[in-house]
Regions:
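Cytosolic-facing regulatory segments adjacent to core modules
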Residues: 1-57, 71, 164-167
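Phosphate/oxyanion-binding loops and surfaces in catalytic or ligand/nucleic-acid-binding neighborhoods
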Residues: 2, 6, 134, 156-160
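Generic secondary-structure boundary/loop-capping signal
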Residues: 5, 115-119, 166, 173
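Short, surface-exposed, polar/charged, turn-prone segments marking secondary-structure boundaries
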Residues: 11-16, 58-59, 89-91, 128-131, ...
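Solvent-exposed, flexible loop/coil residues
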Residues: 12-15, 73, 122-125, 171-173
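Intrinsically disordered, low-complexity boundary segments flanking structured domains
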Residues: 13-23, 121-123, 152-156
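P-loop NTPase motor core
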Residues: 33-152, 158
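P-loop/Walker A phosphate-binding loop and immediately adjacent motor/lid segment at beta-alpha junctions
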Residues: 142-183
């Protein structure tokens, strides 16, 4: 939607037009889809190894989203499984020398807060220890009505953190723009 300008609700209706527009973009986009909890980090690593053998080296990997991956090793507590998944994704980033991005949700205390901090990250706080960079997007009910919100740099291993940015956010077109310098 953010590439073609078609609203998310219209994507299925304009598949042919969208396919043509995407073909004109430089580079290669490879999308691999798995059912929830059917793929693990080993599945992702195996796919990346196959691409590497074909001469395709990823420049960027997006996992949507890590909390829904199947753990390589079953553990008693979900939080330790999640920590392991995030550690494995970090290892993939190192081994393939490219960034790996994923998303996570907040716990209930993160609903409708003005700024989401690492304290509100769902299920396993240890995910935060593994990550090099964490940002959050928060939107109150009023923000949702006004297509606004806040972006907070919660962690930045290699630079400044703690900055809050006002953003424009139109979910229908996946349009997000930073509106100012940090507060």
């Amino acid at each position: 939607s953010c590439i073609t300008g078609y609203p998310l609700s219209d994507l299925a209706s304009f598949k042919d037009d969208i396919f043509e527009q995407v073909q004109e973009i430089e580079g290669k986009l490879i999308i691999k889809e798995y059912a929830t909890k059917s793929a693990s980090t080993n599945t992702i690593r195996s796919h990346l190894e196959k691409l590497k053998k074909r001469g395709i080296n990823p420049g960027f990997i997006i996992v949507d989203y890590a909390d829904l991956l199947k753990p390589v090793t079953a553990r008693k507590e979900k939080r330790t499984e999640l920590e392991s998944i995030y550690e494995d994704l970090r290892a993939i980033a190192t081994d393939f020398q490219c960034p790996v991005w994923t998303a996570s949700q907040t716990n209930r205390s993160g609903l409708n807060v003005e700024v989401i901090t690492m304290e509100q990250i769902s299920e396993a706080f240890n995910k935060c220890f593994v990550a090099d960079f964490i940002f959050s997007i928060s939107r109150t009910i009023k923000d949702k009505q006004n297509n606004t919100g806040k972006l907070f740099v919660a962690k930045n291993r290699n630079g400044p953190d703690g900055d809050v940015y006002n953003i424009f956010m139109q979910t229908a077109n996946v349009n997000i723009k930073v509106l100012n310098t940090p507060n």
